[in-house]
Amino acid sequence: MKPAARRRARECAVQAIYSWQLSGNDIADVELEFLSEQDTQGVDIAYFRELLVGVAINAARLDKAMEPYLSRQLEELGQVEKAILRLAMFELSFREDVPYKVAINEAIELAKVFGADDSHKFVNGVLDKAAPTVRKK
């Protein structure tokens, strides 16, 4: 699969995870609505689905895994930061075929696109600390 298709899958997944976090709707409904309303040309749809459903199913586990590395309470995170961190923690935890440096870099790039001004620095700091524990380098 082309790296660009995976990057687009991550971008779409972060948006859908964000929507799910805010709405509280069933993940299948969020997925269906997202795919019917958004431009998904050039997106690795299978990877998008894996990320979205994987994060939803494992959200509590992912949150618990990242909590020791947060400089503030999980509840104080912005929803965009939380969506990006959950996605990256999912990749670090469940997708060993994705090099940890790629997972971290992709999360930083997502934070630059979707996050507040310095959220990419926060995301980088959390993931740099979490990666050695979550996945043996």
UniProtKB/Swiss-Prot annotation:
<dbReference type="InterPro" id="IPR006027">
    <property type="entry name" value="NusB_RsmB_TIM44"/>
</dbReference>
<dbReference type="Pfam" id="PF01029">
    <property type="entry name" value="NusB"/>
</dbReference>
<keyword id="KW-0804">Transcription</keyword>
<dbReference type="GO" id="GO:0006353">
    <property type="term" value="P:DNA-templated transcription termination"/>
</dbReference>
<dbReference type="GO" id="GO:0003723">
    <property type="term" value="F:RNA binding"/>
</dbReference>
<keyword id="KW-0805">Transcription regulation</keyword>
<dbReference type="InterPro" id="IPR035926">
    <property type="entry name" value="NusB-like_sf"/>
</dbReference>
<keyword id="KW-0694">RNA-binding</keyword>
<keyword id="KW-0889">Transcription antitermination</keyword>
<dbReference type="GO" id="GO:0031564">
    <property type="term" value="P:transcription antitermination"/>
</dbReference>
<protein>
    <recommendedName>
        <fullName>Transcription antitermination protein NusB</fullName>
    </recommendedName>
</protein>
<dbReference type="InterPro" id="IPR011605">
    <property type="entry name" value="NusB_fam"/>
</dbReference>
<dbReference type="GO" id="GO:0005829">
    <property type="term" value="C:cytosol"/>
</dbReference>
<comment type="function">
    <text>Involved in transcription antitermination. Required for transcription of ribosomal RNA (rRNA) genes. Binds specifically to the boxA antiterminator sequence of the ribosomal RNA (rrn) operons.</text>
</comment>
<comment type="similarity">
    <text>Belongs to the NusB family.</text>
</comment>
